[in-house]
């Protein structure tokens, strides 16, 4: 089953996993040490992230390391940029309104 990227990053545990492996590739066991959950639960989260192409697996000997798919993250960031600009404009307008209210 192919999952939606935003469905994948909606979960706080998966976002935390992304943050951890953004720094360095990690094994499921190493990742599981950062959470109060089972290794199996972490593996399920990893599977979802792999399905969405947010992370990839690299085999090193008998170990599997997970690392961030930087190109996919850039693609998401590029798509979000259009909304970032809209909200920056809205916040700027709100700042102007608040400044005018403060002057009154």
Which sequence ranges carry the predicted segments?
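Beta-hairpin "wing" of winged helix-turn-helix
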Residues: 50-61, 65-67
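N-terminal helix-turn-helix DNA-binding core of bacterial DNA-binding proteins
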Residues: 3-38, 63-74, 78
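Amphipathic alpha-helical dimerization/coiled-coil segments
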Residues: 74-104
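Short, hydrophobic-biased segments on the C-terminal half of alpha helices
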Residues: 46-47
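N-terminal amphipathic alpha-helix
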Residues: 1-11, 88-90, 95
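Charge-dense, helix-prone N-terminal extensions
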Residues: 17, 37, 55, 99-102
């Amino acid at each position: 089953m192919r999952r939606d990227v935003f469905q994948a990053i909606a979960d706080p545990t998966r976002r935390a996993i992304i943050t951890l492996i953004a720094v360095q590739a990690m094994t499921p066991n190493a990742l599981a040490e950062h959470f109060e959950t089972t290794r199996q639960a972490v593996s399920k989260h990893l599977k979802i992230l792999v399905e969405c192409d947010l992370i990839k697996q690299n085999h090193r000997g008998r170990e599997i390391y997970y690392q961030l798919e930087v190109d996919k993250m850039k693609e998401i960031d590029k798509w979000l940029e259009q909304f970032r600009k809209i909200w920056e404009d809205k916040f700027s307008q709100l700042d102007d309104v608040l400044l005018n209210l403060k002057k009154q």
